[in-house]
Design a protein with these regions (language model features):
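Basic/polar N-terminal segments that are highly enriched at the extreme N-terminus
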Residues: 1-5
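Acidic/histidine-rich alpha-helical segments that form the ligand environment
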Residues: 79-115, 128-139
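Short, contiguous alpha-helical
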Residues: 8, 12-16, 20-26, 31-76, ...
Length: 157
């Protein structure tokens, strides 16, 4: 991250800190609840939320910003089941790759690949804008995960 400007370094740190919060939240959830969903349609398990964030991060940081395709099955992210050690290992690998992507990103340049249907998004004009979108998504999904954790881990009544 040495070639990044101070404000770009701040963005990189915010992104990694937010992902670390997701990681730690999943780590705190008891193993037996890690693949549980809330009793409502469209609910996702903690593992599904974490895996979705991993796929989302690399899609934008590598496939879009750098033009280096990272295979992703978005639908599978929302039906995934995995034990906690496996999910956290995958998340750790994703974090390392994501940080490497950021360090290679020329923040003020246009992304290498514009996803179909997203070309008109105002934040797609620079790689930094794309990473701000990733930050927005991580914040949203951290909130989703925290609500899921709070309901799954609440004391029985």
């Amino acid at each position: 991250m040495n070639s990044l400007s101070r404000s770009e370094q701040i963005l990189a740190t915010l992104l990694l800190d937010k992902f670390d919060q997701l990681f730690e939240t999943v780590n705190e959830i008891p193993d037996e609840l890690i693949n549980c969903c809330l009793q409502m349609e469209g609910s996702n398990s903690p593992v599904q939320i974490l895996l979705h964030c991993c796929g989302m991060m690399r899609r934008w940081s590598s496939t879009v910003n750098l033009g280096i395709a990272v295979p992703r099955d978005r639908d599978a992210e929302f039906s995934a089941k995995m034990d906690k050690p496996g999910a956290l290992a995958l998340a750790s690998e994703t974090r390392t790759a994501f940080a490497a992507d950021i360090s290679r990103t020329k923040m003020q340049q246009a992304p290498a690949v514009l996803p179909p249907g997203r070309e008109a998004e105002y934040w797609m004009s620079t790689c930094e804008g794309v990473l701000l979108h990733v930050y927005e998504e991580l914040c949203q999904h951290l909130g989703h995960l925290e609500i899921t954790r709070d309901f799954l881990c609440r004391p029985a009544q």
